[in-house]
Amino acid sequence: MTDKRKPTYDLEAFKAAFSSPANLRATGTAIRSAAQLGYGAVEIVGILQTMERTHFYKSMTSYGDHRIWQDVYHVPSSDGLLYVKFTADVVTEFLLLSFKEKDND
């Protein structure tokens, strides 16, 4: 797995793609993790819309395919820092991979 300190994807394009709950495309894991925090689609989209470039943490390659890049952001919320990870997708413009509390590692 490779990491880099520059975003692979345009944050504003990501936010535009997820501008409403109807547009939210996420993995089951991301949806379940968000639900454990009490977040539904409306709340997830609300948090995603607050993301800023300064929240960027790293870009990393997928564990399964080193050619697929994923951007990771640590996003402040009323529940603390959230770990948000997304990638480009063939069918939809982007796919939300993770939405959970950031571990204190």
What are the residue ranges of the model-derived segments?
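Ribonuclease/tRNase effector modules and their secretory precursors
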Residues: 1-105
